Amino acid sequence: MSRKYFGTDGIRGEVGTSPITPDFVLRLGHAVGRVLRGTHDRPVVLIGKDTRISGYMLESALEAGLNSAGVDVMLTGPLPTPAVAYLTRALRLSLGVVISASHNHFMDNGIKFFSARGEKLSDAWEMEVEAAIEAPPQWSDSSQIGRARRLHDAPGRYVEFCKSTFSNELSLKGLKIVVDAANGAAYHVAPDVFHELGADVVRIGCEPDGLNINDGVGATSPQALVEAVRMNGADYGVALDGDADRVLLVDRNGRLYNGDELLYVMVADRLAQGEPVPGAVGTLMTNMAVEVALQQRGVEFVRAKVGDRYVLEELVSRGWQLGGEGSGHLLALDKHTTGDGIVSALQVLQAQQRNGRSIAELLDGVELFPQTLINVRLAAGQDWKLNDRLARERIAIGNELGQSGRVLIRPSGTEPLLRVMVEARDAAQARLCADRLAVAAQEG
């Protein structure tokens, strides 16, 4: 049975359009509360949010719904998604909730949940909540209505947690670091983490106004960080997204490092420290050069479906620690239960510090294969899997590339698009092959 409201990362959509409306979120809060009351005598739920103006409205509706079901609520105000996961676990709470649409612009918002262990919840739990949404409400007796209070020291608690993932024997003294918080949830915590570890911090994307989240700044618009690093003569730049669960880095030369490269650095550092790394998990989109480089070092590499949720599932099933996506969602499960942009940046900077080499030097010999990605718009009702011309072209190109490249064709999960990606050692060849596939997809 498919889910009606939940997607791959909670519930998300345009504000004012179902399901991101105050009335639905009230019902959602009540439904979640009823589910929790089935397993907890007096549940306590932590609610965090990013800096979107709609967060105030949705927070109030969610709080009211939970209270109406007899659930107590703790409010953190703007706080990164991974901070909510951490605090839910650290404070032994029943559930953590984040109101955020991550890297999207302010017009969108969403709601996602973490278990008492700070982990994303199962499909079965989400189905149970959806059933409760459709059922008639069961209001609590007046004496059993939940209470709400603010957790005023939430930012400070999270800053200390982030710092604890960085070696006590190291510091960032002598480094100038530009921190770009995307005008999002980490605007008031990310700069403090790097500053308290000794770095000279320059802030950009740290002035949210409710409307400017992810607007020309952050991990989805890294050029702003590249320019700021150069302008300030900084050693490194750190770009987070709106809820700070992903990160990209920039060095003093303006070179941008994506999640694939940062994952390799994290794995290589563990190996250099003599720590066992049996394997790492990427996605179908992870650059082939990273896979080859890791295998040459004796590290098994497995590809999951696109999405940090699937990377996490694969890591847990195999008992591994490190994984990630090119977008900057990185997982180090011995440090945190979920992807954390700040913690991931610290792991990379720690590798740079204790190896005495720049990030570029740590990536020496790992040259990313050129990738060409084309989005092909599909006609209504068009089934790309029945396109014989596309199938023949895909086989032909696969034979041409051999072990020096690969082809990936997959549908978008949100739009009527077919994503065609070709990876090859030669950029011109990747482009030519991708164009051939796109034409076949459109005309087949």
Swiss-Prot record:
The modification Phosphoserine is found at S102. One of its GO terms (cellular component) is cytosol. It is an enzyme of class 5 (isomerase). Binds 1 Mg(2+) ion per subunit. SUPFAM superfamilies: Phosphoglucomutase, C-terminal domain (SSF55957), Phosphoglucomutase, first 3 domains (SSF53738). Its cofactor is Mg(2+). The keyword Transcription regulation does not apply. GO terms for biological process: carbohydrate metabolic process; peptidoglycan biosynthetic process; UDP-N-acetylglucosamine biosynthetic process. GO terms for molecular function: magnesium ion binding; phosphoglucosamine mutase activity; phosphomannomutase activity. Mg(2+) binds at S102, D241, D243, D245. NCBIfam families: glmM, PRK10887.1. Catalyzes the conversion of glucosamine-6-phosphate to glucosamine-1-phosphate. HAMAP family: GlmM_B (MF_01554_B). This is Phosphoglucosamine mutase.
